[in-house]
Amino acid sequence: MAAKDVKFGNDARVKMLRGVNVLADAVKVTLGPKGRNVVLDKSFGAPTITKDGVSVAREIELEDKFENMGAQMVKEVASKANDTAGDGTTTATVLAQAIITEGLKAVAAGMNPMDLKRGIDKAVTAAVEELKALSVPCSDSKAIAQVGTISANSDETVGKLIAEAMDKVGKEGVITVEDGTGLQDELDVVEGMQFDRGYLSPYFINKPETGAVELESPFILLADKKISNIREMLPVLEAVAKAGKPLLIIAEDVEGEALATLVVNTMRGIVKVAAVKAPGFGDRRKAMLQDIATLTGGTVISEEIGMELEKATLEDLGQAKRVVINKDTTTIIDGVGEEAAIQGRVAQIRQQIEEATSDYDREKLQERVAKLAGGVAVIKVGAATEVEMKEKKARVEDALHATRAAVEEGVVAGGGVALIRVASKLADLRGQNEEQNVGIKVALRAMEAPLRQIVLNCGEEPSVVANTVKAGDGNYGYNAATEEYGNMIDMGILDPTKVTRSALQYAASVAGLMITTECMVTDLPKNDAADLGAAGGMGGMGGMGGMM
């Protein structure tokens, strides 16, 4: 086991604080509408330019192991805020630095660290309740666009795109961000249910100009099995041909004689048919077939529940207004399923989302909800260079997370104003002893830090602006983009409540742990020079030549 280097008390805390400051100082220059960029060197390819706090934090690794421990603990604050709310990483880092700095001063002055931590925790718990009281719902497109704009560093086009996407696919819809091909940002919306399976034979194509299969008002046969024998399908095919409508077959697979017969029938114009594989694998495929059945008002033909394909009737088939099938995707538009059944299915999947343990499962379930309840929107980010594309894509993703958080828990006045108002409301909060009172003051003073940093990044004097904002009330604050005072909500400067709350809670959590640290242990660096010196002694063997 390697030897350890151990530091105690003030020595440990000073080193830790130094690491915290290096990381926080690098991250906090990005805060606010006039925040600066940070350039990150990459081992290959062009450097990355970013204003995303968590991207900067993730790159920082310090040589001194004690300092690095401090930096890594604050990095955890940024990562946690990012995982929970998707934004607010820089705010969380600024708050953590402020609480740690003030808290360690109090510890150095002889205060009891445990009581300080209790005071900080008490202030933060009260502050979270006050934030919830200040929060207003965010439901209209204008507010959503404003939140997106602020989070994307005052880029109005991004805010409007996200609001438009949410309008089109609903609050439950899936919105993804991809690289665009041009200079302009674009929004693509897929209506209806789309899954990533294309036609099984190009002979089904009836729109050669687009290379697609389009079926108007088709019947939809859903089978949880491989179909290779055409005799199984004859009763259904005859019934569909009599009804004079097209047929879409979604099955585990359609192969051999069955596929060949379907192709021949289609080419001769006897019945218009297309076949695709069912999406997903294993249990997920069964679940997705059931989703499609609910959406189209059909029944999944499955031998597990005693249903046979030969006995299927038109009543077992689903229906939709239109189906479009490409080489890689199938889109079902306007299924005729009952709204109550669809909502019941959505509620069932939501329950599974709450119980899911892995992020992958949760994401796949969320996609299924979106396909049933809303739709899928794709924001294609346009940029002139790859470096700009990466930076802009990160901003759009941040803005998307922020708007989702805003819809979930509402919004408060932005620009650090909400925390200032919360701190002033808690001015009379008291703990059980004087040291807890100091902890409360540490937390309340730290709540001014985000506003001060935003102002500092503008090149203004933080104390002057902070005192002016504190003298006002309600949503009165400082708009750093235009450098004027006014009602933040009227000016469209909004922060999602969830983002502000998460930033404060995670900052206080890690800061409390660091304030109560009394000892730090790390590996001693290996002395490579000594090892090499020992090996070098073997060179003397060359003298053995004299023995002849």
Swiss-Prot record:
Please name the SUPFAM superfamilies in this protein's record: GroEL apical domain-like, GroEL equatorial domain-like, GroEL-intermediate domain like
Instruction: Kindly list any coiled-coil regions of this protein.
Output: none
Q: Which family does it belong to?
A: Belongs to the chaperonin (HSP60) family.
Its recorded reaction(s) are:
ATP + H2O + a folded polypeptide = ADP + phosphate + an unfolded polypeptide
At the top level of its lineage, which domain of life is listed? Bacteria
Q: Which residues cross the membrane?
A: none
The UniProt function text for this chain reads: Together with its co-chaperonin GroES, plays an essential role in assisting protein folding. The GroEL-GroES system forms a nano-cage that allows encapsulation of the non-native substrate proteins and provides a physical environment optimized to promote and accelerate protein folding.
Enzyme Commission designation:
5.6.1.7
- Name a single GO cellular component: cytoplasm
Q: Which residues bind ATP?
A: 30-33, 51, 87-91, 415, 479-481, 495
Signal peptide positions (record) = none
Subunit description: Forms a cylinder of 14 subunits composed of two heptameric rings stacked back-to-back. Interacts with the co-chaperonin GroES.
GO terms (BP aspect): protein refolding
Localization of this protein: Cytoplasm
Q: Which UniProt keywords apply?
A: ATP-binding, Chaperone, Cytoplasm, Isomerase, Nucleotide-binding
| Annotated protein name in UniProt | Chaperonin GroEL
Query: Which HAMAP family does this UniProt record tie to the protein?
Result: CH60
- Source organism of the structure: Escherichia fergusonii (strain ATCC 35469 / DSM 13698 / CCUG 18766 / IAM 14443 / JCM 21226 / LMG 7866 / NBRC 102419 / NCTC 12128 / CDC 0568-73)
Top-level EC class, please? Answer: isomerase
Q: Which GO terms describe its molecular function?
A: ATP binding; ATP-dependent protein folding chaperone; isomerase activity; unfolded protein binding
| Disulfide partners | none
Any Pfam family from its record, for instance, is Cpn60_TCP1
